[in-house]
Amino acid sequence: IMSDEYDNNKSYQAQSSEVMDGSTGSVNPDIDYVRPAEVGEQDLYHGHSFIEKWVFCQDAKVIGVQYFLTAVFTGIVGLILSWLMRLQLGFPELAGFMTAEHYYQFVTMHGMIMVVYFLTALFLGGFGNYLIPLMVGARDMVFPYVNMLSFWMFFVAVAVLMASFFVPGGPTGAGWTLYPPQTILEGTPGSGMGILLMLISLSLFVIGFTMGGLNYMITILQARTRGMTLMRMPLTVWGIFTATVLAMLAFPALLVSAIMMTLDKVLQTSFFMQQY
């Protein structure tokens, strides 16, 4: 293969040093001219096994599909929780298996899942990864490896969140806003392992989103195709870019708050719990 490429390069060089003189029909070697060379299709590597395509894949489209499927799964869980809440409100005699603590926990997890783990992941993670490179003319995100890591951080965050349903005491029931210090006080539903797993999940989610958000912003600002100014960008890309900037300003504060509340819970610090 290497010898064939070498022979082709030699032939292109020979062609570039010769050109036919239109007036005399003779070869004029003094004119520096390169004939347009036909370039064959380039074979790009595409993984075919499940692990190569869905685990270690750095293709923005595949990552967008991964975000979409994971977000839809969390959305289905949130939908089931909303059914249980409405069942308790509409037919309390039929929902005897639900206590007041269960209702608080379902409201908390439904709100957190829908606002953070479903909408953000679906519209920014899913549609953002799939549409941004297509609409700005980029081959891929500027940092494909970081893009892959951002999804798996989100996936682990969802796994930790779902694990909180199966710990003693169940998930947190402090409300989806998680106001401190009520969230970690004894007597609040899920104030044990439930709130701890929620805080860990939020921290992982924000770290993963930060990696993905920086990727979006740099791709939009630096990897647009030639001629596409910011004023010529599609409104869809503008919407994703604006939402990403707003989230990048808000989520770091959420991360710090989650870490401080975790330290209050585990190490008995006094960021929110002044009695310690």
PLM regions and their residue ranges:
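Membrane-embedded and interfacial regions of multi-pass energy-transducing membrane proteins
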Residues: 4-6, 12-276
